Amino acid sequence: MDNIIRFIDEKGNLLPLEEVQKSVEAVYEDFSREQCGCEKYDNPLVESTSILSSLTNPDNSIDIEEVTNKLAFLDRTLYLTDVIQPESAISYADMIKFWNIVDDIDEIPVEEREPIKIYIDSPGGDLDATFSIIDAIALSKTPVWTVTIGRGFSGAFFIGIAGHKRFGFPHSTYLFHEGCAENGGDAHKFIQGVKFYETRLEMLKEHTLKHTKITEEKYKKHKKDDLWMTAEDAIKYGVIDEILTEIL
């Protein structure tokens, strides 16, 4: 606080009442800014009481990434932007479960619940982890919207089509295929593993035919190779419901 209240001038004479009042107002304004931690800066774009002012205030020790993550979570927004792993699948299931519990406690009717949004930009990943996230979405009473903002490849493709509503960015891309698997052990265990994997692939097929307009004939044609799609193609095949023209 740089200002002080002055009653006399440099010669020792009493200052006019108007000047004393201005001095009091300046001190009060300084004190008020210090209390809220929002001093004005030279940049006129940053208002003293704005959130940006608080975040950029050098006196505040704020981890921007941590703040962003917390705000996203409070906004019911999740990001699937890496390889899909079992650990991350548990995290997504927990967050979906959390908001269902909140809505249940608040007794909010399903049709009035604020949706959980999953933003997707992923190359895919573990098949079991993929199914875990798909099941969490399917079992959620609170609506879960999927928004493919970049890559909806492999496992991320199957998660994307699971949303109660499915959206895509204008330049989002999609890759449908059944992926690959590794198996080891002796011959008997190898055969068992192959049979079980075939069962999982059949589940992927049922999931795809249920949630898209991809026909069984087209599925069989592309399941062992790659079917690439633009956002427009994704609309055509019922992979997404809408191409976004603004951020949700």
What positions do the PLM features span?
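Terminal-region recognition feature
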Residues: 1-248
